[in-house]
Amino acid sequence: MKKDIPVKKNSTYNLYITGMGTKGEGIGKINNFTIFVTGAILGEEVEVNIIKVNKNYAVGKLLNIITPSANRVEPPCDIYTKCGGCQLQHMSYKEQLNFKRQKVKDALLRLGGIDVEVEEVLGMENPYRYRNKVQLPIGKEKGKVNIGFYAPRSHNIIDLKSCFIQDEKADKIIKILKEWIEKFNVSIYDEKEHKGNLRHIMVRTAFRTGQIMIVLVTKDKKLPHKEELINKLTEDLEGVVSIIQNMNSQKTNVVLGKESIVLWGKDKIIDYIGNFKFAITPLSFFQVNPIQTEVLYNKALEYADLKGDEVVFDAYCGTGTISLFLSQKAKKVYGVEIVNEAIESAKLNARENNVDNVDFIVGESEQIIPELIEKGIKADVVVVDPPRKGCEKSLLEAMAKMAPEKIVYVSCDPATLARDLGVLEELGYKTMKVQPVDMFSNTYHVETIILMTYYGDKKK
């Protein structure tokens, strides 16, 4: 029997928002039929125009807020509704944290069958200006230079004068770059035609040391009038220690190419997380919110509860940041990462910080763990910080065979976290603590750190 759909495209309806979607959309129902509304908040009555209808849900465009929520605030950014960078600026920060906590709780219960207390989200004192890295496409439309983020679900560049989640000095750098492009009529890359030269700008700021790296991404090696830009950037701004040109001649959405040349200054900047020093190059992975990264890693250390004689296994060690934190309290840490360049950076970071109780290994953790077991090496604690897609099931099974007393799972996606925890619970682990951390304020993203303890059969 065909399901009757109670709404029609291009029609207008009043709607009560009774829930929130995973990307911060308001959710309401008409005759039990679900409607998603970007920009609406739980508890509001809104007027919407239906712009998309599927058999199980519809999407409504917010036309009018009939009854606003007490948690609604005026977004500070004047391009907030056009830009794809933030999704929650219209919510009070307290409500953003409530939303993120509920998002984690819902995912664990609905997708993992795990009913557990979720702690209040560890938020920021100031939820703005927290990003230490920004990379922006550069384009031209009707003769006007645009530097900014892409509009949602498009490659249309929304020009920005100021971004409230990136470091303020990046705003000044972008302004100088735009003036230079206009003054010298600098060739700008057209991604449709694969013509032109200047593609992206990336700015990396070391919050602790104040050092700034500016990366100009071009299609060609030639960069006319670069001396004028270098002079302006270095004269007008404090902290600039590195200006780099990165060449990317490929027809691709990948921002950085493989070849870089130093135009001025150094080839890296230095920053700290806790007491550890890290060298950052254009291609280095480094957490974009160093303030909350320290909060997150200290929580990982707390959950691991190391006494000094434990062996720890870090299954997605990247450039070694969590491994180094764990090394402070562990007897030995083994860090594994499939990307060779990341392992080389991890080894360098260990040397630079005089850490000698960490071994970094290139490979897949699901293959390395059995090799370590064969050598008689067993972990007391396993830490995983996987990409958004979560862990391979074979890794979870290998971890369970190693049977560590504790697993500390750091996740950037509640859905894949819930799936993986469900698997681990079947393999003999119990979820004990769930702590969300707000790493990406004003966006729908949330980081979560989990403590699991072993209760299964040690002989398996």
From Swiss-Prot:
Pfam name, any one: TRAM
Enzyme class: transferase
CDD domains listed in its UniProt record: AdoMet_MTases (cd02440)
Record-annotated disulphide pairs: none
Example of a GO biological process term: rRNA base methylation
Family matches, as PROSITE patterns: SAM_MT_RNA_M5U, TRAM, TRMA_1
Classification via Gene3D superfamilies: 2.40.50.1070, Nucleic acid-binding proteins (2.40.50.140), Vaccinia Virus protein VP39 (3.40.50.150)
Binding site for S-adenosyl-L-methionine: Q287, Y316, E337, D385
Keywords, in A-Z order: 4Fe-4S, Iron, Iron-sulfur, Metal-binding, Methyltransferase, S-adenosyl-L-methionine, Transferase
Enzyme Commission designation: 2.1.1.-
Keyword Ion transport attached: no
Active site as annotated: C412 (nucleophile)
GO MF, any single term: 4 iron, 4 sulfur cluster binding
Domain TRAM per the UniProt entry, residue ranges: 6-64
Keyword Flavoprotein: no
UniProt binding sites for [4Fe-4S] cluster: C77, C83, C86, C163
UniProt similarity note: Belongs to the class I-like SAM-binding methyltransferase superfamily. RNA M5U methyltransferase family.
Name this protein carries in UniProt: Uncharacterized RNA methyltransferase CTC_02481
Species this protein is from: Clostridium tetani (strain Massachusetts / E88)
